[in-house]
């Protein structure tokens, strides 16, 4: 329903993520301090919507790719995407509490993050196939990126992710939410050649197809002929890879600014 658009966690969590991105880039924690109480209220709201640690509303991996009309997440379960984002912002809040020396909140939200991680693994992990959710690229990339996969299973899940990309002819199936986690999971695991192969072509899904089509701005859909907006801040997550991985311009972990 419309509430998915009004309060999808993948967009709402920007309120928590952005102050940290600002801090990591500039070394300025003023936004974390200024908005801490609001960040906490938002997370406490998500907790009221969770059922045993699982958040089940929102748009999921919006506009993911396949032989269907783009829109609501089709390749990846909405609760998997929503719960992973819930986990991410709770982790951030625990870190914010540590920065503010709020020991009660550190303990509270660290414990909550562990409970969410356990619930996520219980709900979505398939031990027999070593995959999460449907085994889609987003299903496996999200928990890998967020460090939710148990150490013993990590390589197998990553191998399954790579196998799925290859099974799709070195093409992605992620949408506007999953792209970042897919791209960064590959980059952080030294799979930049695969990233290059996945994007260095002129077919949909791919940026080359948009260029060949004549687009001068990013389009909302991988194939602009399908309609939707032809000037949209969408699918631009490769920028982060250009800067961080290709050009080597990135922040040093643990050294903000």
Task: Write out the residue ranges for each language-model feature.
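Active-site core of glycosidic bond-cleaving carbohydrate-active enzymes
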Residues: 1-257
């Amino acid at each position: 329903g419309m509430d998915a658009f009004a309060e999808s966690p993948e967009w709402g969590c920007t309120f928590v993520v952005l102050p940290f991105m600002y801090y990591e880039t500039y070394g300025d924690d003023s936004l974390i301090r200024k908005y801490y109480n609001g960040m906490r209220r938002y997370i406490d709201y998500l907790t009221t919507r969770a059922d045993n640690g699982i958040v089940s509303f929102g748009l999921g991996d919006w506009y993911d790719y396949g032989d269907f009309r783009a829109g609501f997440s089709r390749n990846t379960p909405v609760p998997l995407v929503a719960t992973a984002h819930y986990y991410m912002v709770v982790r951030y809040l625990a870190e914010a509490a540590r920065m503010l020396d709020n020991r009660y909140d550190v303990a509270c939200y660290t414990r909550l993050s562990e409970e969410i991680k356990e619930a996520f693994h219980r709900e979505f992990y398939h031990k027999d196939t070593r995959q999460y959710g449907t085994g889609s690229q987003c299903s496996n990339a999200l928990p890998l990126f967020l460090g939710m996969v148990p150490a013993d299973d990590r390589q197998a899940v990553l191998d399954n992710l790579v196998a799925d990309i290859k099974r799709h002819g070195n093409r992605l199936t992620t949408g506007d939410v999953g792209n970042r986690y897919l791209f960064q999971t590959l980059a952080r695991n030294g799979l930049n050649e695969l990233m290059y192969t996945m994007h260095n072509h002129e077919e949909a899904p791919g940026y080359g197809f948009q260029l060949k089509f004549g687009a001068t701005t990013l389009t909302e859909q991988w194939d602009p002929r399908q309609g939707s907006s032809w000037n949209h801040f969408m699918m631009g997550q490769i920028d982060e890879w250009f800067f961080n991985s290709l050009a080597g311009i990135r922040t040093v972990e643990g050294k903000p600014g």
